[in-house]
């Protein structure tokens, strides 16, 4: 194995935990009178502003921005606009369904990314990732199929919950190609592509622009002002912990691991969401849904065993 994948696997896990905190912040924000579109407006504006300040302050950030062509810069901006559709359907679904269920439904996307990668990106090699993908997909099916008949969620919530991973899968493949990935290899192995320090702030700017257009198109003000006092800290959290951190970490990790493998590793996200939602909001899953969560976690272990097992064991096989 050329170098260790473990740091990049951990980076994707950090991204997953960041994204997984999003539903928790949303559940704190919605009771204050803000809805999902208000949340998205502040989330992406604050995330973009904070990250642009950081990137422009860092010499490496300024150097990364100078490397990109106008065409690639516009592509990164356009990807950010596409992300609005994913974020809108996901956070919109939380109006009607539990955060734990939304987290599980989202994880249909690794299977979609894996299929798309066969045609448009670097598909996983060997049998192990595909076996792990089958296990993870089964876990998602168990999670969604374990809905209690006595607490059937609204149809619109389920429709939005299903639409989100489809849109996100397309976003991931396009972002991977922007990072230099193709059918012949990952972005890091092939070289080229937009570095994360340039791609992520441009993408966040595009997302913020897209949210503002959506707000104006629906007859709303550009920004919901004032922010309710009880929503201020959760909004800062959703902009940083559930915004800047996961978007940047996933882009950087996927550039090394490839889109399909990164998507598979990030299936640990619903584990975090489920546990945290249970501890904070008292949400509970059925035993079948818990089994689905265990299957998802096991799938990641199967897929990345070469990266996470003890170093001595790898040396024993000449790796």
Label each PLM-derived region with a short phrase.
Residues 29, 39, 43, 93, ...:
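Hydrophobic/aromatic residues within transmembrane alpha-helices
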Residues 7-15, 42, 62-89, 156-164, ...:
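Loop-to-transmembrane-helix transition segments
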Residues 24-36, 64-65, 95, 144-156, ...:
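Membrane-interface helix termini and inter-helical loops of multi-pass transporters
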Residues 18-23, 55-101, 105-106, 142, ...:
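Specific transmembrane alpha-helical segments of multi-pass solute transporters/efflux pumps
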Residues 38-49, 83, 91-124, 164, ...:
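Specific alpha-helical transmembrane segments that line the substrate/conduction pathway
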Residues 1-42, 81, 89, 150-190, ...:
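Glycine-/small-residue-enriched transmembrane alpha-helix faces in small-molecule transporters
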Residues 16, 42, 102-108, 174-208, ...:
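Helix-helix packing/entry segments at the starts of transmembrane helices
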Residues 51, 116, 125-147, 276, ...:
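Hydrophobic transmembrane alpha-helices of multi-pass small-molecule transport proteins
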């Amino acid at each position: 194995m050329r170098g260790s994948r473990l740091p990049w696997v951990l980076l994707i896990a950090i991204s997953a935990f960041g994204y997984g905190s999003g539903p928790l912040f949303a559940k704190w924000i919605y009771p204050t009178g803000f809805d999902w579109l208000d949340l998205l407006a502040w989330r992406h504006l604050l995330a973009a502003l904070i990250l642009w300040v950081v990137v422009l302050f860092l010499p490496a950030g300024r150097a990364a921005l100078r490397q990109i062509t106008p065409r690639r810069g516009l592509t990164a901006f356009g990807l950010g606009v596409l992300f609005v559709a994913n974020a809108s359907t996901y956070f919109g679904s939380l109006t009607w369904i539990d955060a734990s269920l939304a987290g599980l439904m989202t994880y249909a996307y690794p299977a979609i990314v894996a299929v798309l990668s066969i045609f448009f990106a670097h598909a996983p090699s060997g049998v192990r990732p595909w076996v792990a993908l089958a296990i993870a997909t089964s876990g998602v099916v168990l999670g969604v199929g374990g809905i209690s008949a006595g607490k059937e969620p609204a149809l619109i919530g389920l429709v939005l919950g299903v639409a989100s991973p489809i849109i996100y899968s397309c976003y991931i493949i396009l972002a991977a190609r922007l990072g230099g990935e193709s059918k012949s290899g990952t972005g890091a192995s092939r070289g080229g592509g937009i570095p994360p320090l340039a791609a992520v702030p441009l993408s966040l700017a595009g997302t913020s622009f897209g949210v503002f257009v959506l707000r104006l198109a629906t007859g709303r003000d550009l920004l919901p002002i004032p922010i309710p006092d009880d929503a201020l800290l959760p909004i800062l959290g959703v902009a940083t912990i559930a915004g800047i951190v996961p978007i940047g970490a996933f882009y950087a990790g996927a550039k090394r691991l490839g889109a399909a493998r990164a998507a598979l590793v990030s299936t640990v996200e619903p584990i975090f969401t489920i546990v945290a939602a249970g501890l904070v909001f008292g949400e509970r899953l059925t035993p079948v849904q818990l089994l689905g969560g265990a299957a998802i976690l096991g799938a990641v272990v199967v897929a990345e065993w070469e990266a996470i097992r003890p170093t001595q064991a790898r040396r024993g096989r000449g790796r």
